[in-house]
Amino acid sequence: MREYQSISSLQTFVDCPRCYWLHYIAGLDGESSPAQVLGSEVHEAIRDYHTHGTHSNELSEVGGKLYKVYVENVPQSILDEPEREFLVPLVNIVTGEKLPLPFKGIFDGISTKTGWIHEHKTASNYWKLEDINDNIQATGYAYAYFILFGKLPRGIRFNILKKNKITCKYQSLETWRTYEDLIYFFNWAKRIFEEIETSDFAPKQTRFNSHHKMCPYAGN
């Protein structure tokens, strides 16, 4: 039985219940994609930058370019808590209803002085405001911030690092969440909890064809 849920686990179930079962119940870890490997590499370097002023890990060519673009645009002192982990109860902030498992995640960075959450993303294309205004991760992390600090975050800033073989670009987008959004997040999570309880974990084709290697849809 799982001890917690996360944005990744809940979203995986929404995308493909079979992939959820394989990864989160059977414990069969899938292989990381090249994009995931690059993202982890850059996130680690950014964490070290905000903690120590420089990075300690060896970077790939593209990873080095993305890191360079980041430090040229984001001050080292802007975050006082890079990669802060959290584990919070999933509670309806109005009714007090509580879900059986807590919510776990990691803020890429927060500033306790300004109240901003920072999320770092590597991407092949520029993002649009719609991408972050409807982003369930941002809503979930705003909820976690509220539970931890007793107030809404001032905002969520996405530091987007656009990659290509020649040049890498930096894009900053900002979004906000309301108390109504926090209730929406609880209800979203509750619905998925209920669906998991009765699911037969049948496979489902995902939008971007991203599947666990043992899913019948893998490679299709």
Where are these regions (language model features)?
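Non-catalytic protein-protein interaction segments used by genome-maintenance enzymes to assemble
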Residues: 87-138, 146
